[in-house]
Curated annotation (Swiss-Prot):
Belongs to the bacterial ribosomal protein bS16 family. The gene is rpsP. Residues 99-110 have a biased composition (Basic and acidic residues). It comes from the Bacteria. This is Small ribosomal subunit protein bS16. HAMAP family: Ribosomal_bS16. One of its GO terms (biological process) is translation. The lineage of its organism: Bacteria, Pseudomonadati, Pseudomonadota, Alphaproteobacteria, Rhodobacterales. The keyword Ribosomal protein applies. One of its GO terms (molecular function) is structural constituent of ribosome. SUPFAM superfamilies: Ribosomal protein S16 (SSF54565). GO terms for cellular component: cytoplasm; small ribosomal subunit. It comes from Cereibacter sphaeroides (strain ATCC 17023 / DSM 158 / JCM 6121 / CCUG 31486 / LMG 2827 / NBRC 12203 / NCIMB 8253 / ATH 2.4.1.). Residues 88-116 are annotated as: Disordered.
Length: 116
C-alpha cells in the first residue's frame, strides 16, 4: 500500500482549511484517510503559531513506515526540522523554447548584417 502524507481540503468556498493526513495514495484527496496528523490554515498570518499544527511524533512514525510527503507537506516538514531541505533545481526552465531561440537567432543575424 503506497502511503502519502498530504493535505485534505475542508472549509467553505473561498475559505480553505486543510487537514494534514496519512492516507493511501489511491484514495481521493478529501476521501478516506488512516490518521489525521495536523492542520493547516492558509488564511492566518505566516508568523502565526496556529497556521500549521502537526503531531510530529506521528508524522515521524508514518515517515518510518514509508509514507511519502507531498511537496507542500515536505516544505512544512523542512520548516519543522523533520526533513532535510530538498534541492530544487530546474536548469531547463531558463532555456528558451524553439520559437524564442529562432527569433533570437534571426535578430542576431539582422544585427550582424546591419553592422557590416
Amino acid at each position: 500500500m503506497a502511503m502519502k502524507i498530504r493535505l485534505a481540503r475542508g472549509g467553505s468556498k473561498k475559505r480553505p482549511h486543510y487537514s494534514i493526513v496519512a492516507s493511501d495514495s489511491r484514495m481521493p484527496r478529501d476521501g478516506r484517510f488512516l490518521e489525521k496528523l495536523g492542520t493547516y490554515n492558509p488564511l492566518l498570518a505566516k508568523d502565526s503559531e496556529d497556521r500549521i499544527k502537526m503531531n510530529l511524533e506521528r508524522v515521524q512514525y508514518w515517515l518510518a513506515q514509508g509514507a511519502q510527503p507531498t511537496d507542500r507537506v515536505a516544505r512544512f516538514l523542512e520548516a519543522a526540522g523533520l526533513k532535510e531541505k530538498a534541492v530544487r533545481n530546474n536548469p531547463k526552465a531558463a532555456v528558451p523554447g524553439k520559437r524564442m531561440a529562432e527569433l533570437a537567432k534571426k535578430k542576431a543575424d539582422r544585427a550582424a548584417a546591419s553592422a557590416e
